[in-house]
Amino acid sequence: MKISILGAGSFGTAIAIALSAHGISVNLWGRDHRNITHINTYRKNLKYLPTYHLPDNIYATSNIDEVLSDNNTCIILTIPTQQLRTICTQIQHKQHMCKNTPILICSKGIEITSLKFPSEIAEEILQYNPIFILSGPSFAKEIAEHLPCSIVLAGDNKELGESLIETISNDVLKIIYHQDIIGVQIGAALKNIIAIACGIIAGKNLGNNAVATVITKGMNEIKTLYIAKNHSIDLHTLIGPSCLGDLILTCTTEHSRNMAFGLEIGKGRNINTLIDHNLKLVEGTSTVKPLISLAKKLNVELPICISIYNLLHENISLDKAISNILS
């Protein structure tokens, strides 16, 4: 059995470690040829997870044809949302190699140009591949340490989804199936912005009560966008791992890049400098613009999210943003 993972960053590497530890051969693709060479030579991803050993049944490559040409059980995409269209197009050009292969997407956010969620981008391009979203509270380092997490595999094909879960679920990746593919992605996108807000509150030393208030209000904003986008609501999604679970994890620990980013803002660091240094790592900064555009399109109000947008992009004062977040 072989699975290919496109994206050799922290999360892709961690997933590769978790799968390979349970006997699955993994192809791991990344763009950085030097880092890929280090992985195969030293069995460590020196750029992203330098302290974790990669088992011998992980083969890394910077040649995307190599990972698409094998008979994969599935292909897992662990790449930023803004790069997803390019990667899906590359897969589409190799359809003779991987037609009908299930695609599992771990990307979180909204595409800036189209205002589409990751599954919508993939379904537009990969019309012959079953599309699933793999999402939930899951820090890469904990997965690499073989610590358990509960995540969701969401998609329209229940029979195939449950079959995939039997293949990839183990004592580290505890996976449940859900058909609500859009609802899962709404929670995944908004939680990063809410986490920035929680970090700001914590950085200003406004207390745990205020952080809890922001999490509660943030959950309501997830529900608001969820209803506007889906025209209905599934409580199993809203209070499950991909929404409530991921929101709690991302908003309550400095191990979260988004909360850590907000903490630095709350402590008075220059916002533009922080954005320049963290743009590729902090998903909330790239999600907030298309999110606000989508909210306007759907005619919904998201007070916390618009406050973070105004703080990052419209130069409102930190005190004003905090007042709006807590009001």
From Swiss-Prot:
SUPFAM superfamilies from the UniProt entry: 6-phosphogluconate dehydrogenase C-terminal domain-like (SSF48179), NAD(P)-binding Rossmann-fold domains (SSF51735)
Residues that coordinate or bind NADPH: 10-11, 31, 108, 140, 257, 281, 283
UniProt GO molecular function: glycerol-3-phosphate dehydrogenase [NAD(P)+] activity; NAD binding
Compartments where found: Cytoplasm
Reactions accelerated catalytically: sn-glycerol 3-phosphate + NAD(+) = dihydroxyacetone phosphate + NADH + H(+); sn-glycerol 3-phosphate + NADP(+) = dihydroxyacetone phosphate + NADPH + H(+)
Enzyme class: oxidoreductase
Keyword terms, alphabetized: Cytoplasm, Lipid biosynthesis, Lipid metabolism, NAD, NADP, Nucleotide-binding, Oxidoreductase, Phospholipid biosynthesis, Phospholipid metabolism
Superkingdom, taxonomy of origin: Bacteria
Entry keyword annotation includes Phosphoprotein: no
Binding site for sn-glycerol 3-phosphate: 108, 136, 138, 191, 246, 256-258
Example of a GO cellular component annotation carried by this entry: cytosol
Active site per the UniProt annotation: 191
Entry-linked InterPro entries: 6-PGluconate_DH-like_C_sf, 6PGD_dom2, G3P_DH_NAD-dep, G3P_DH_NAD-dep_C, G3P_DH_NAD-dep_N, NAD(P)-bd_dom_sf
UniProt record, GO biological process: carbohydrate metabolic process; glycerol-3-phosphate biosynthetic process; glycerol-3-phosphate catabolic process; glycerophospholipid metabolic process; phospholipid biosynthetic process
Family to which this protein belongs: Belongs to the NAD-dependent glycerol-3-phosphate dehydrogenase family.
Free-text function comment from the UniProt entry: Catalyzes the reduction of the glycolytic intermediate dihydroxyacetone phosphate (DHAP) to sn-glycerol 3-phosphate (G3P), the key precursor for phospholipid synthesis.
Name the UniProt record assigns to this protein: Glycerol-3-phosphate dehydrogenase [NAD(P)+]
Protein species of origin: Ehrlichia ruminantium
Organism lineage string: Bacteria, Pseudomonadati, Pseudomonadota, Alphaproteobacteria, Rickettsiales
